[in-house]
Design a protein with these regions (language model features):
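Phosphate/ribose-phosphate-bearing ligand recognition and processing surfaces
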Residues: 51-133
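Glycine-/small-residue-enriched capping loops at alpha/beta junctions
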Residues: 1-75
Length: 133
């Protein structure tokens, strides 16, 4: 499974599914699937993420990323895109994606979309650090 970082509008990607992280809409750490609607992807995976400062925030965020990636596997799709997360969350979501590699079967490509150059650089730096460790 390849992990990529790009600077783009996530809704413009030709990808099987995009992940919509939300702090509401179910139990934190879970994920649901709906159709792609008016975007180019086939599916939207909504991952329920913790609110900033919530108890056990890092573990819950990791659980939400894993849940979204497991949903992608259940759909037997090959690609999924996440919006890039800012700050300390970047390390958590990238570590979760790297750790998920051992579980990937159909999923071949995970893309993180940064919306600005600063976030793109920060995510790239964190990804390099994690891949080197």
């Amino acid at each position: 499974m390849i992990i990529e970082l790009i600077r783009a509008d996530i809704t413009s990607l030709k990808i099987d599914a995009i992940v919509n992280p939300r702090p509401t809409g179910g139990d934190v750490g879970t994920a649901t699937v709906s159709s792609g609607g008016n975007v180019l992807c086939k599916f939207v995976i909504t991952a329920v993420v913790p609110r900033a400062g919530e108890e056990s925030e890092e573990r819950k965020l990791r659980d939400a990323i894993f849940a979204a990636l497991h949903r992608a596997e259940e759909l037997a799709i090959s690609s999924v895109a996440f919006p890039a997360f800012a700050g300390a969350a970047a390390r958590v979501v990238l570590r979760a994606a790297l750790d998920f590699r051992a579980h990937a079967r159909s999923l071949q490509r995970v893309v993180f979309c940064a919306f600005n150059e600063e976030m793109h650089r920060e995510f790239g730096r964190v990804l390099q650090e994690l891949e080197a460790s």
